[in-house]
């Protein structure tokens, strides 16, 4: 079972310093119209040990310097599925530049040319045999 840590606003400096090599990342927003109407509401990170960090950003100022230091760190690979939305939301609200990303949807389209099924559900089923 995964260990889950919840944070309001930002991760701690200790957590930021503990994140090495690669992390999985996903975001949630109040909708898809960013920045016109919707806001970034949740950031989820999982480290290489399966430890999950759930960050609820401060929607008044979106200050998260420790998280930004991780997102901008070129030595840490950020892995996610269909990162276009996540990356743009993080960059807009946190005023940062997310570096060194690996998008599993793009990788699927490049490598799995035998199908047009590139959704996360399809990848999990094919590679992990899970539904």
Report the location of each language-model feature.
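Conserved RNase H-like, two-metal-ion catalytic cores of nucleic-acid enzymes
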Residues: 1-122
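A short, charged helix-loop
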Residues: 122-131
């Amino acid at each position: 079972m995964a260990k889950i840590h919840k944070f309001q606003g930002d991760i701690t400096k200790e957590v930021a310093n503990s994140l090495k090599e690669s992390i999985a990342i996903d975001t949630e927003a109040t909708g898809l119209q960013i920045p016109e109407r919707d806001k970034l509401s949740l950031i989820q990170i999982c480290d290489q040990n399966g430890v999950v960090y759930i960050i609820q950003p401060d929607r008044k100022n979106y200050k998260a310097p420790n998280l930004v230091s991780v997102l901008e760190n070129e030595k840490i690979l950020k892995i996610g599925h269909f990162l276009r939305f996540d990356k743009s939301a993080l960059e807009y609200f946190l005023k940062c530049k997310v570096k060194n990303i690996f998008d599993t949807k793009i990788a699927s389209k490049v490598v799995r040319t035998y199908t047009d099924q590139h959704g996360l559900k399809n990848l999990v089923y094919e590679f992990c045999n899970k539904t």
